[in-house]
UniProtKB/Swiss-Prot annotation:
GO terms for biological process: DNA replication, removal of RNA primer; mismatch repair. Belongs to the RNase HII family. It catalyses: Endonucleolytic cleavage to 5'-phosphomonoester. PROSITE patterns: RNASE_H_2. Its EC number is 3.1.26.4. Endonuclease that specifically degrades the RNA of RNA-DNA hybrids. This is Ribonuclease HII.
């Protein structure tokens, strides 16, 4: 009696190599259900192999530093440079050596539905996490570039007192005035897993803040646009005026501050 399709599917779930002899054995099984299960498992393995290769490539900076003797590499990234409202948020994350988290990438490349899952995975596996938040008032005072630096420095400071302290910093497109060895990486959130981890922590943290602001200041769509200048946000500005979290140094908010006809 031939093996049931259900049993074959269960056997295939345990297969992790495309060279497994089970594939060759099942290739001669004419049942449509078996062939569908066979192709499905092969495709899943190919997807897993591609993901493993991608994650391995994103560890290249970290692996080079491990070879030089560095043990605790912190990735640093920020979210919120461009919005018209809300803070700029930076995160500093130290992952265990050679740590790979499936799906971890530049937060802009991760589907929103998966943000929370990957964020939780980073929180569970990270050796240390620091978060720096600079509000809109300080952004207006010092400019967004300097505010981003301050947020990053605050994120590093938040690691003080935690068990693991960084001996090297990988930073997304920024150099910081701090006595820790560091490297600035252009598009670092897409090229370093440590920076990608910081990217998703900063992203989810800021999105949660903006969702809270949406409840306090309805009508601007903050929960959906995170403070960026979308059509809904601009319509809200026109209808309801400027809120306490708007950046008055950013246009069109800046011009509205000088226009006495605005609400």
């Amino acid at each position: 009696m031939s093996t049931s399709i259900k049993a074959i599917k269960e056997s295939l779930e345990a297969v992790t190599s495309l060279l497994d002899p089970l594939f060759q054995e099942l290739a001669t099984d004419a049942r449509l259900g078996v062939q569908k299960a066979l192709k499905s498992r092969q495709k899943a393995i190919q997807t897993d192999l591609a993901e493993e290769e991608r994650l391995e490539a994103m560890l290249s900076y970290e692996k080079a530093l491990y070879k030089k003797g560095y043990q605790a590499i912190a990735g640093i990234d920020e979210v919120g440079r461009g919005p018209l409202a809300g803070p700029v948020v930076a995160a500093c994350v130290i992952l265990p050596k050679y740590c790979k988290i499936k799906g971890l990438n530049d937060s802009k490349k991760i589907p929103k539905a998966k943000h929370e899952t990957i964020y939780q995975a980073v929180k569970e596996q990270a050796l240390a996490i620091g978060i720096g938040i600079i509000d809109n008032q300080l952004i207006d005072e010092v400019n967004i570039y300097e505010a981003t630096k301050l947020a990053m420095l605050e994120a590093i400071k938040q690691l003080e007192g935690q068990l693991t302290q960084p001996d090297y910093l990988l930073i997304d497109a920024m150099t910081l005035d701090i006595a820790i060895s560091q490297q600035s990486i252009l598009k670092g959130d897409a090229n370093s897993l440590s920076i990608a981890a910081a990217s998703i922590v900063a992203k989810v943290t800021r999105d949660q803040m903006m969702a809270n602001y949406d409840r306090i200041f309805p009508g601007y769509g903050f929960a959906k646009n995170a403070g960026y200048g979308t059509k809904e946000h601009l319509q809200g500005l026109k209808a309801y005026g400027i809120t306490p979290i708007h950046r008055k140094s950013f246009e069109p908010v800046k011009s509205m501050c000088c226009d006495s006809t605005n609400p």
